[in-house]
Amino acid sequence: MLFAFCGKRQAVENLFAGTLAVLPAPVRAFWLATADLQAGASQSAKRQFDELLPGADPVLRTAIERRLSRISIPPEPFDATAERVVENAATEHGHEEKFGLQRSLFSSRARATQILIALNVLMFAVESYLGGSDDGRVLYRLGALFPPAVRAGEWWRLIMATFLHFGALHLTMNMLGLWFLGPFVEFALGFRRFLLVYLLAGVGSMATVMAISSGANAESLTVGASGCVMGLVGATGSLMLRSWLRENALAAKRRLGLMLLIVSMQVLFDSVTPHVSMTAHLSGAIIGFAAVMILRDRLKTPATQQLTVKS
């Protein structure tokens, strides 16, 4: 616990509010007291150690007694170089926390993602009930994109097609993508802006497919949330690019590289796989990227929260 031994209580609290929240309460209290001790607040640290001691297990008890034996020894001061190292470490960790993609699907901040997954699964159940998700007549009836029908006035197909899937594997792959990316993008944009980007990417990708359809493709059905999910890939890339430029966050730069890799692999896969719409995937990613570039996000660190390593 670098930050605890450096007396940086706020940084330790940030760790316990994030990745280390799973640690037992006595362990967290021990390290917070250690941070206070190293910061020179020996009386506060002693009080916390004394409160922990009666209920501590043998390992924790030994560690507490070791700290108490040094309670009267003043901590060694840090020079400017050491302070910079600690500040850089705290900044890098903060970026990893903020730009990490491991947001929980079951968080209260992922309501839109939960709703979208539920709607996609529900529509797949309806497909199966009416005759099967691989039955073209069923898909057409429920709203698959069919360019002649859309040109005849059935514009609602541009939306409905994004909630239909051809087979369980198609549904599973798209829902995994939504599960992986949705909570982070929703956290960054908020409920309404997230839904706006998701639907813009989906409808926009379907409209692009229809606009450039010709020959045999003009008479084919198109379904799937792939354009929406690729829109989230583009949205994530946009958020990471903005954060990298705004905060010089290396964590955001690395995630941006990951999004570019995903798009590249998707293009490669589409180019060698029949009956897969590269047009929908690429247009969805581009729309998602462009939409987020003009929307506000919630990832910017307020000035009052930037110096998190001060004692």
What are these regions (language model features)?
Residues 1-22, 27:
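Alpha-helical adaptor scaffolds
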Residues 15, 27, 34-38, 48, ...:
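A detector for small-residue-rich transmembrane helices and their helix-helix packing motifs
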Residues 21-22, 54-55, 59:
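Structural marker of alpha-solenoid helical repeat scaffolds
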Residues 43-44, 60:
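Sensory coupling linkers of modular signal transduction proteins
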